[in-house]
């Protein structure tokens, strides 16, 4: 009997059973082969007895599949006659009196039957634990391999610097790239792509998170696409500058390598001239030093002419102007780069790129690390950019301002549209409508012709008509069916309980970090469940600090901050995205964050924020920035918070995802307080604007557009 049971179990479990330790398989088989074992309805008894073990041993992927497997086991065991028959109910021949045959003596309690040992022995549990650790090590190894590949790719990026040499070949104009493919990790992102970048045009690259926008930019930066001229300077602003003792200003100036070398040579020659200054020989003949001095003077003259030709003397002013536009004060420009945070070093990288003016500039979310003042300056600067650039951005208004064309990446294809993002959206919508109409018309024609052909195919009298229909069907133009992107969703859970107002209250609260000056004085405000607030102000003014005071991560130096004992606060920031375990997958990450919660419940919650299907099982290092943000949102909102504190929540999301985020925030049944400079997000999801400046918080009476116009007029 056990041999038959063994063959059935291995047949149902298939290949996965071969990877399970023998003691565990023996235990499962012996439990199911017991002659008194009751499989129950649809294998429920088997699920109760060995279901947890099957999942733990990875014989099945989850409990849902486990139920199906247990049902199959029940059926298979039944076909082999190994299932205990269900007892039938028979009618009694005559009534029975329940007290017949019973004496009045005390009833002896039946001793409980000995229960089998634990489901698994300690040895078996240890084996399962070792298997889990082995899987963790394997995931970590794959992640480290991915990191090494990325570092190698970055190391392979060509060094780009200011190019003053216009004599080495013709100037770069239009760039034609035809029939190219882009893939990563064996997955095709662009297939048979073709695109022409016209000189001086400003392109916005749009598409869903994970479609391959950043990878496409990297391919171009590495000249990995045929059609890019070898002498074309391409600069991809992707990573922050490495911090060292070089000042921010000098870091930008150092990109002009020729200028730097000429200035260094000038200093060396001047020093040498001072050392060798001596009168001529007594006989009036020039000495060796005099001849060398003449040569040095001649070289100095050449250096000065070249420095003048390459505008070397205006370079410092140009670099300082760019840094100032990106919110660097004169004092900050003279600070060492290793004293700046990652966000500020990213600004220095952007400043270097703008100073270099490459033939093709590639910008990936350039506004992520900028405040509104810097964004407005960058908009103006890029609008006047004389060469070609491609920008990826989630900021709709930014794209509307700076781009002249849109490149749309969808379904592994690239399409180009004239105009800004709003024009693209209208054009694309009309195009999709027309394509759908053409497809439906074509299908109706095909169906009508095919019906005629099928009806009269064997009718000799209509043979000629049938043949003409067949030829017409072959000639009928093929129209592709419209494949729409799946709808995005951000469904934030509704809190079960609602604490009374105010849930957060500041009363004369002041704050300063230990040993430093007060950043805020006498703050007085309250936040309720119906609050919809956006805080705006320059970077470094303390907006994120206020969010930490609200959440309780920081305590006021004086005054009080009241928080309702029942309030649950969720905080989203770039720190939460950066803190994800990239070697894990979203589902496993959530299971570790919330142990004991059923897998299906966690899957459902991930799905409510757009992390569905296979995406929930992909290693997180393969996810795009926007997809990682969704996982971070899932983690912080699982406990059904009453208040969402959001620090730049739209960073890394694509434009459709920002739209879905707006809808999710509008429907959220709780309070919202965000820090953002995204005009579309703020205008669509909040109704209060707070301006942070000079250690105070003041309400702004107007729209975000009004605030933006006020800033523009002041600069």
Curated annotation (Swiss-Prot):
Which residues are annotated as modified residue N-acetylthreonine in the UniProt record? 2
Residues at which ATP 1 binds: 207-214
Signal peptide boundaries: none
Going by the entry's taxonomy, the superkingdom of the source organism is recorded as: Eukaryota
Residues binding ATP 2 are 537-544
Per the record, the GO terms for biological process are: defense response to bacterium
Among InterPro entries, the record links this protein to: AAA+_ATPase, ABC_tran_Xtn, ABC_transporter-like_ATP-bd, ABC_transporter-like_CS, ABCF_EF3_subfamily, P-loop_NTPase
Keywords of this entry: Acetylation, ATP-binding, Nucleotide-binding, Repeat, Transport
Q: Offer an example of a GO molecular function term for this protein.
A: ATP binding
Q: Which family does it belong to?
A: Belongs to the ABC transporter superfamily. ABCF family. EF3 (TC 3.A.1.121) subfamily.
Any one annotated GO CC term: nucleus
The region called Disordered is annotated at 96-118
The uppermost taxa in this organism's lineage are: Eukaryota, Viridiplantae, Streptophyta, Embryophyta, Tracheophyta
Species of origin reads Arabidopsis thaliana
**Cysteine-cysteine disulfides:** none
Q: What is this protein called?
A: ABC transporter F family member 3
Q: Where are the transmembrane segments?
A: none
Domain ABC transporter, by residue range, is 175-436, 504-713
Q: Pfam families of this UniProt entry?
A: ABC_tran, ABC_tran_Xtn
CDD domains registered for this protein in UniProt: ABCF_EF-3 (cd03221)
